[in-house]
Structures are given as structure tokens and as C-alpha cells.
Amino acid sequence: MDPTIPIHTVICLVCWSFSLLPLCASSSRHLLPGKPLSAGSTITSNDGTFALGFFSPSSSGTKQYYIGIWYKNIPEDNVVWVANRAMPVTDPSSATLAFTNGSDLALSDTNGQLLWTTNISAAGNSSSEATAGKATLYNNGNFILRSQGIILWQSFDYPTDTLLPGMNFRITHKTHALQQLISWRNPQDPSPGNFTYGAHPDEFLQRFVWNGSTPYRRSPVWNNFLVVGQYIGSIKSTIYFTLQTVDDEVYISFGVPAPSVSSLVLVKMDCSGKMKIRTWNSNVSKWTDLQSEPNQECNKYGYCGPFGYCDNTQPIVTCKCLDGFEPNNKQDWTARRFSQGCHRMEALRCGQGDGFLNMSSMKVPDQFVHVKNRSLDDCIADCTSNCSCTAYAYANMSTKVINGDETRCLLWIGDLIDTEKLMGEGENLYIRVNGFIT
């Protein structure tokens, strides 16, 4: 979830109660070699916030069981990580999570079927001192496997549908694969669902929710500093988002400085396709959505068509044409069918006095060309000299330590797709128009 996304109401609530195994008779902080975890036991964080063990999300019918991490003292929507999403256990009494002869953790049944593994050995990270290793569930919800003080594997590197405070989420892929959040299939089935959240493979400055392979929602393009904060009145604290490099990869993360709140705030990719920032309200014993996107139909990807934009500043959020444009089909537009978008009122006259109209507080369009190491004048000249350039946007950044560039020049060639006007946020978008309009 991006800090620049406005707060909206929720269209689809995802609430269910997890039927955790009522067999939990013992608990510890660590999983050790020779001491497997079986149904009836859990690993618990030191402060009691999180637990790891077997659970079933189904409250009726044929139950399937998973190894997961959940909030121990929250009764609903409490699972934040699942190991064996695609390989459930049908008989929990026959399955264990244990160290193998190498340095791996493996979930298997009595028939020897491997249902899930950390797969460290295959990655070449195996330790000859595996018997000295241990896996610990920490107070932040991270399950870490160490050997001789070295981290061999951690659950934070393999998110399912949830980001927790302090978790680094990788948005580049120089030496590692991009990380993604993948929704549950439905509220009672944690197998991989239809919706995926992650960075665009070719541009870490923006992130997408995809429905299958189709863009469903796009974040605003990053145009700011390495740390961005947003005060949330309902929790009386600031949620901050950071952009940072670790081992030559770029990561985003979020945090909450108030200790009493931070362990109960999360970012979730839900099964309806919404990215939510949620907090547990102990006063009413329910989750509260602090942010939820997309909220309106016109917040969905490309909903307003080419050269149209979603205006979030009006009491009724709807599509409009960019300045200097009008609907392609006015009858459809009146009937709130916007997919055909808009066309120019006046044709361009390249080299004969074309100008640029400034639209402020915009989520700039998709499908841009990112030109690096440009001054503002250079960026303007690049667009002006190219008759196919339909718009530009420019920002001074603090990302030089990340990509060697402290500016961001974006150019658009052709149609402008998936544009929005935001409430008190966004940036300037300069749209090329006939000089008579300016």
C-alpha cells in the first residue's frame, strides 16, 4: 500500500473466524532439531503476540490444515503467514514440522510426503552445523531459522498476503526475484488466489494489483523522499513508509512508531483485490480499515479510458476528460460508461505553437518513459522536441543513493491511461495541447 493513496470506504469486507486447532496443549519459543512440531503444540513469540502452528480456516465441512502464523489474541482474520498454501494437510495427527538432516525445515506426513520445506539446501545455504540450528518466532511475527548466529531463512522473505511493520518488501530484481503478495482464494481457503500485489518488473517506482495478468489497480508513481509519513487520527500515530536499498536491491517497508499500536497494524492483499491498511480495535474487538484501495469503480485501472481521469476531489467520484479533451461518446459518458475515453478538442500543430497545460494534484498516467539524470529544462525540451510526446512530469527526488538519480523525468508517447486527480496529494502533469487552448 502506497502512502499517497487516499483513504476511502470499503466495498467488500472480508471477515471470517479461524478455527484454530483446539488441541494446543504446549507452547515454546523455538523449534529445535529432534523436537518436531505436531498438532497440539505451537511456537509462541516472547511477548505472546504471535503463534505458529497448525490451523484450519474452515469452520464446517471437510477441514484442511496448514502451518501458519497468527495473532494469538485476536479471534478473527488473524492469520498473517501460511507455509503450505498449495499443499494442505488433511489429517493433522499424521503431519509434523521438523528439521531435516540438513539445515531445512520440512512439513511432511507419516507417508513421507513432503508438503512444504524451507529449501535452504537447494539454495546452497546449508550449514554443516545444522544440528545446532533453531527456528524462533519473534515479537514482530518473523519466524527465523538460524545456525551459529547466521540467518539461513526467515518468513519475512516469503510473504503470503500480508505485510507486517518492519518487513522489507523487495521491489527490484537485480539478484533476487521480485516479492509479491498473493491473495487467498477465498476467506476459508488460503491457497493462492486471483489477485497479486507487487512492483512493475521494469519500474520499481510504481506498484500494481493484478487480477491474473490484467492490471486491476496501480499505485501513484513514487515522487518523493525516502521516508514518507501520514498521520492517522484514529490510531493517534503516524504510519511511515520507507524506500531503501539492502544488498543492491530496493525495498519498501512501513512502520508505526507507537509501540502500543505497531504490533496490531498490517497491510493486506485481500481476496476481493483490495490493498488494505488495517488495525485491530480492541475496544470493539474488530478490525478497522484505515485505507482500502480501490474504493470507487473509477479507481480501477484504466476505468476512464484514454485521456480520461478519475476525479477523487468531488462529492461524487467520477470520470472526467483531461483539460483540452472531450468524450469520444457523449451518450456513453452521460450513461457513466467511460471506457472509450476522450479525444482532443483541437489537433496538435507540432512546431507551430503547441503548449502544455498544467493539471495539479494528479496521479500521473501509466506507460511512461522514465528518462534519468535530466534537469527540468531538459525534461521539457525532450517532450517539446518530440511531436509524439503527449505529456511530461518532473520531480526532484531523494533517490540518488538508490539509483544514482535525484531527479525523475517522465515522458508519455501516445495515449494517457489510468490517470486520477487526488485529494491534496499528487503532482503536476503537463499535457500537450494546441497552442490556441493554452
Spans of model-derived segments:
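Beta-rich ligand-binding surfaces for carbohydrates and other polyanions
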Residues: 2-438
